[in-house]
């Protein structure tokens, strides 16, 4: 069950099945390092730390801004309410998707810390075991048609749940060792009903395939994307 822990300037949302004491410094990488539970890291906009919980591995991410504005204001966001914080919205969106049967990481805990008119945020979520992103896989070998059908079906499930993934690209689609497809990274994504956002999601995904084809010579051809979209259209609710 999801619970909340509050004190004077912060709110923590957490899954009580996975986190017993949210007052522990679970959002500080130094805490996990001191207990020898850091299993790895990945660099992007910031460092994502992979840590070992009792029953699963988790990914710890501090929210950071990108682009030119991010160079000026790295990790502060305007506060407009606890439920409107980036971490709370991503946490809730993951729960919504899981309830809809979409393969996404399980949210473990999220924290927003308010300071004046701004806040900082962190998210602790499940690290999908034995999974690789499409870029990594396609650099080695092409995917069979059936796997593109699975990818299309998973995107359709997400769309049918009314979730607009505003950064859908092949770095954010994973395949695990059981050939299960996962979708990750839902920061700034949202529930949405009307508009052309489903089409825009697919256009963005297609651009990412073409970009990596030029950049890394991945094993991919446009026919693969047609298979993906055909499978998606069979499940997508208009």
From Swiss-Prot:
SUPFAM superfamilies in the cross-refs: Protein kinase-like (PK-like) (SSF56112)
GO cellular component: plasma membrane
Catalytic activity annotation: an alpha-Kdo-(2->6)-lipid IVA + ATP = a 4-O-phospho-alpha-Kdo-(2->6)-lipid IVA + ADP + H(+)
Record EC number: 2.7.1.166
Keyword Iron-sulfur: no
NCBIfam families reported for this sequence: PRK01723.1 (NF002475)
Record-given protein name: 3-deoxy-D-manno-octulosonic acid kinase
Encoding gene per record: kdkA
């Amino acid at each position: 069950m999801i619970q909340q822990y509050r004190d004077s300037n912060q709110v923590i949302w957490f899954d009580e099945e996975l986190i017993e004491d949210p007052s522990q410094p679970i959002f500080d990488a130094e805490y996990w390092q001191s207990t020898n539970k850091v299993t790895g890291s990945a660099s992007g906009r910031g460092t994502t730390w992979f840590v070992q919980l009792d029953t699963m591995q988790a990914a710890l991410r501090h929210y950071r801004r990108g682009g030119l504005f991010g160079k000026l204001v790295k990790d502060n966001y305007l506060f407009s309410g606890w439920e409107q914080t980036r971490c709370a919205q991503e946490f809730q969106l993951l729960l919504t998707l899981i309830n809809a049967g979409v393969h996404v990481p399980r949210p473990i805990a999220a924290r927003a810390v308010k300071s004046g008119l701004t806040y900082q945020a962190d998210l602790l979520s499940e690290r999908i075991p034995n999974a690789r992103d499409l870029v990594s896989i396609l650099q080695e070998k092409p995917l069979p048609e059936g796997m593109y059908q699975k990818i299309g079906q998973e995107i359709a499930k997400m769309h049918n749940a009314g979730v607009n993934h505003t950064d859908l690209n092949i770095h954010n689609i994973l395949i695990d060792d059981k050939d299960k497809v996962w979708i990750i990274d839902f920061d700034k994504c949202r529930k949405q009903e009307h508009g052309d956002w489903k089409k825009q999601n697919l256009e963005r995904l297609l651009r990412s395939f073409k970009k990596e084809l030029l950049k890394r010579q991945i094993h991919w051809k446009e026919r693969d994307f047609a298979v993906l979209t055909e499978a998606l259209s069979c499940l997508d609710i208009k």
